[in-house]
């Protein structure tokens, strides 16, 4: 959430619309949530009573909510409350979608795969745009891909590409670094390798290289990965990443019309 907030501050027109909520216990913030249209609502860790109240607040003004993402118990509390708000949006049903693993790393074991890392530039922009769209389509989150300013959006991303034997073979991005009570954190993502270049270790090589860049700054690296993709999770484990949490995706289904 923090990296998205930084992006919105820097580029207010990056999303169609955006909302942030915080849950407080007195003067203490005990939870937060955000939504950047047209994407899902992200729920952070928070008391279950707070997530139930949030559901009521969201239902009042957001009948186009496509789904939610967050810790399982927080999502469950939100969904139970949302189903009883009586709003148009709440009459949609929800179904469990993808489960993501939250992974962090303390000690990097660099990949031995040959190649070089290069930052996004005019010379590789076309490839980065193509691969960004392909990645979004694969994770079923391609709502931005047809935006008129999509190329400009890609230009603003902190992307790196892996080149082997003169050919671009994989890509990884870095989100904005966020300051937390536990220190600075930078998220790795997206990570994408075209199908024809997979199973050669290029994804692990580029992920390891950008992780090293993060660690050189003194920040801690983290990433989200699809729990249903054993190949990528094996790669991350080999690099030294460890699973510390999970988040669930719940998709909303519009009611049938007569």
Segment roles from a protein language model:
Residues 1-38, 258:
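N-terminal entry module detector
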Residues 62-72, 184, 214-225:
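Conserved GNAT acetyl-CoA-binding A-motif
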Residues 1, 108-142:
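Short amphipathic alpha-helix that is part of the acyltransferase structural core
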Residues 1-18, 140-163, 168, 173:
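Active-site rim helix/loop that mediates acceptor-substrate recognition in acyltransferases
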Residues 18, 22, 27-36, 161, ...:
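Conserved beta-strand in the GNAT
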Residues 69-75, 222-233, 237, 250-257:
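Conserved beta-strand-loop-alpha-helix junction that forms the acyl-donor binding cleft
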Residues 48-57, 190-195, 199-216, 233-238:
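Conserved acetyl-CoA-binding loop-helix of GNAT-fold acetyltransferases
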Residues 25-31, 35-114, 250:
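Acyl-donor-binding surface of acyltransferase catalytic domains
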């Amino acid at each position: 959430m923090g990296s998205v907030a930084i992006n919105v501050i820097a580029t207010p027109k990056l999303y169609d619309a955006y909302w942030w909520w915080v849950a407080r216990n007195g003067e203490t913030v005990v939870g937060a949530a955000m939504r950047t249209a047209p994407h899902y609502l992200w729920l952070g860790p928070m008391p279950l009573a707070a997530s139930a109240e949030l559901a009521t607040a969201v239902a009042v003004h957001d009948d186009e909510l496509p789904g939610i993402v967050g810790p399982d118990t927080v999502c469950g509390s939100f969904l139970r409350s949302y189903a009883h708000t009586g709003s148009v949006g709440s009459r949609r049903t929800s179904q469990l979608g993808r489960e993501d693993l939250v992974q962090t790393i303390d000690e990097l074991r660099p990949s031995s795969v040959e190649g070089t890392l290069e930052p996004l530039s005019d010379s590789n922009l076309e490839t980065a745009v193509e691969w960004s769209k392909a990645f979004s389509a694969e994770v079923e989150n391609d709502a931005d891909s047809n935006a008129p300013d999509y190329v400009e959006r890609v230009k603003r991303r902190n992307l790196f590409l892996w080149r082997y034997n003169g050919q671009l073979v994989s890509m990884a991005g870095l989100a904005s670094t966020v300051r937390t009570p536990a220190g600075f954190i930078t998220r790795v993502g997206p990570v994408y390798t075209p199908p024809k270049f997979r199973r050669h270790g290029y994804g692990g090589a580029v992920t390891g290289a950008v992780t090293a860049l993060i660690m050189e700054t003194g920040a801690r690296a983290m990433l989200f990965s699809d729990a249903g993709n054993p190949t990528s999770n094996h790669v991350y484990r080999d690099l030294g990443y460890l699973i510390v949490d999970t988040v669930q995706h719940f998709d909303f289904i519009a009611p049938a019309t007569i």
